[in-house]
Amino acid sequence: MSRYCVIGSGISGATIANLLSEKNSVDLFDTAKGPGGRSSFKRIDKAKGFDHGTQYISPKSLAFKKFVNFLIKKKILKKWRGIHLFLNKAKKENKNHLKIIGRKGNNDISKNILKNINCYFQTELKKIDYKDKKWVLTFSDGNRKIYEKLILTCPFAQLSKLSKEFIKAPFIKKKVKMDANITVMFSIKKTNNKDERQLIEEKNFE
């Protein structure tokens, strides 16, 4: 049994950690407060929150479709039947385009497949060393941990900074620009006032 460390709790990191855990010891680390990565969920209280990463998933491959259908049967995912506006005038809308979301949030996939994995959140990997055929990892809280195997699923900028000393493949030297994305998240309280309800409905369709 090997001792693995996986950096990143998005769908890729969570899937890798889950598969490796069948025959190995696995720890997973992420800088965020919880799992999800690019499909993270921003909670504003115990009952409400926002999907501020992935809006939905639309499985294409047969293997992924089977996995998604399995999670739908387990009531972890569901079909998104809300009202959607297709605004791309240069492309024809696919009326049969399937939209799948988490029942509680789009990080439900990661949460489900990581439920039996040792996860450490709000912990950033700052430095990697390789000594005596082991990976020595230094984290933002000053802790150092040693692993036989290391898998990085973090964004490219972080990956390049941490691993360029060890990865000799040409891709690591590429300059990948990641554009900032501004997301506005707001909630509206329900009201019994007819005029206020009408104003909200009008604003939603402007």
Where are these regions (language model features)?
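Short hydrophobic core segments
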Residues: 5-7, 29, 125, 144-159
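Glycine-rich FAD pyrophosphate-binding loop
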Residues: 5-7, 18-46
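N-terminal Rossmann-fold NAD(P) dinucleotide-binding loop
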Residues: 13-14
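N-terminal FAD cofactor-binding segment of flavoenzymes
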Residues: 19, 40-84
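Central helical "cap/lid" subdomain
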Residues: 36, 147-198
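Short beta-strand to alpha-helix junction loop
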Residues: 56-62, 89-112
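A conserved short coil-to-beta-strand element within the FAD-binding core of flavoproteins
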Residues: 121-136
